[in-house]
Amino acid sequence: MKLVLIDGEHYPDVISWAIKKLGDVCCAVFLGGSEKIGSIGEVERKIGVKVYHSPNYLDALRRALEENKVDEVVDLSDEPVLNYEDRFRIASLCMLYGVSYRGADFHFKPKPLKKTKKPSLAVIGTGKRVGKTAVSGFIARTLKEIAKPVIVTMGRGGPEEPELIEGDKFEITPEFLLKFAESGKHAASDHFEDALTSRVTTIGCRRCGGGMAGFPFFDVVDEGVKLAENLPNDLIILEGSGATFPPYRADRYVVVVGAKQKLDFVRGYFGTFRVSLADIVVVTMADSVGEERWKALRDAILEINPDVDLHFIAFRPRPLGNVSDKRLGLVMTSSEALPKAKKHLEGLGAEVPYTSDNLSKRPLLWRDLEGFRGIDAVAVELKAAAVDVVTRWALEQGIEVIYLDNEPVNIDGKDLRKAVLELGRALLGGRA
């Protein structure tokens, strides 16, 4: 059945004519405008279907979607009642309810979201380089206290067939990763990073393309989830890729937002869809912005999802090896995070004479590595060219490789670890 969006800038006779041409219309939502109508009751009598209305048109649309079996929302409105921002808000709400939304020259159609057979938690982001994998790894480490999680990742460098890494059963060494990379595979994929930093079982999957709302174009996540469901693990963590997420309706959601992202990517477009899904929102790299930005992010997120548990965190480098009394070269992707990471490692007793923020820029990375002289070890995040460039270079030079994790630390007085444990207990105690 169709739900139509209507306004008072169209005469009721015109709306009635359009509804008859559409056919199969169960109800309408009145968006506003009064130039060409009298009362809502008059409109309802003229068009012959129930009309939902509210001072907030999204509340009316939400109620209509919950009370009717709607497959498609059809937009019969226009400027000035609706603008581009309004239409993205409507599209986000339609994605949340799993219904199609189309107008005269646009069509947003959600992919069907499947359910896992085991309790599931999705970790998704509002963009790339927001620290989603670091947050996912932290969640897995935390939930190991009360569960046996398995992480299903999806990535543009992921394997064509789901790849199982039993990170809880063997040590992932630089030599192992390099050998894997030399076989032609991407050894810095998220499932390797999660297995290395959290010592849990992970399953890596491939995806290609990502739509505006976050649905992948092609992926092999179904096969990965089936594999996870046949393992003895009791909780599945579904990890997104960039702003794209696995096509599953998880039981719980953690949404990761970068503090320096454009605010419109959070409160507009399909950011509202992602934030609406969240049980917990983690704003990462919050130490890189001021109070005014904190307030803007808080206001935007809570306006979309008033009940969400909101956390502002900073990342602290967590070396997966001893750095004390060692002379290090430090390699990362973020130029902004680099000075803070250097200072933190020096606080752990390391000397850090050389740094590079070109981990994702291979030609510049090679140049930087050639300047690293007289070091005992290289500390590097497991992403981008960490294995096939940095690890290979270090092992050829006889230099120790120490991989870095990014540990989320609250800077807002709250406790993300406690929140994750509470979410995990609620999830394991009974699925929504």
UniProtKB/Swiss-Prot annotation:
A GO term, aspect molecular function: ATP binding
EC number: 6.5.1.9
Cellular component terms per the entry's GO annotation: cytoplasm
Signal peptide: none
GO BP term, example: gluconeogenesis
Statement: the UniProt record of this protein carries the keyword ATP-binding: yes
Catalytic activity reported: (2R)-2,3-bisphosphoglycerate + ATP + H(+) = cyclic (2R)-2,3-bisphosphoglycerate + ADP + phosphate
Gene3D superfamilies (UniProt xref): P-loop containing nucleotide triphosphate hydrolases
Role this protein plays: Catalyzes the formation of cyclic 2,3-diphosphoglycerate (cDPG) by formation of an intramolecular phosphoanhydride bond at the expense of ATP.
Similarity section: Belongs to the cyclic 2,3-diphosphoglycerate synthetase family.
Protein's UniProt name: Cyclic 2,3-diphosphoglycerate synthetase
Native organism: Thermococcus onnurineus (strain NA1)
